[in-house]
Amino acid sequence: MLQPARRKYRKEQKGRNTGIATRGSSVAFGDFGLKCIDRGRLTARQIEAARRAISRHVKRGGRIWIRVFPDKPISQKPAEVRMGNGKGNPEYYVAEIQPGKIVFEIVGVPEELAREAFRLAAAKLPLRTTFVARMIGQ
């Protein structure tokens, strides 16, 4: 699963996920992309599950790019622990997603196959997504 190799600080404040994606909002590497149209978080497990769904469907063909990286730690306290006594330990990592962000890209497969692979991957993600193709001249 994806997670940072090292971090300067183990824990991070919650923050607010606002605005729309300006960077990473167009297909840059592949021919087709899976674009999020909702705001939210993708965990490393969700990204990996979607990647596996795409890989299984396209079999040996094509090349896949993951355009997001889960670099934000989410901390949790253990079950049945009283309130207080500081912040919990980091349990998993998430990628903050703004509307318009491309999550996956693929090249080397026909459009119908890419569409179906992204449909299967979208079922693994908690956000609404749409299929996009590379613009002519990009």
Curated annotation (Swiss-Prot):
Complex formation: Part of the 50S ribosomal subunit.
PANTHER family: 50S/60S RIBOSOMAL PROTEIN L16, LARGE RIBOSOMAL SUBUNIT PROTEIN UL16M
Function noted in UniProt: Binds 23S rRNA and is also seen to make contacts with the A and possibly P site tRNAs.
SUPFAM superfamilies the record matches: Ribosomal protein L16p/L10e (SSF54686)
Keywords: Ribonucleoprotein, Ribosomal protein, RNA-binding, rRNA-binding, tRNA-binding
Domain of life per record: Bacteria
Disulfide bond annotation, renumbered to this chain: none
Basic residues: bias regions: 1-13
Protein name: Large ribosomal subunit protein uL16
Species in which this protein is naturally found: Albidiferax ferrireducens (strain ATCC BAA-621 / DSM 15236 / T118) (Rhodoferax ferrireducens)
Pfam families (UniProt xref): Ribosomal_L16
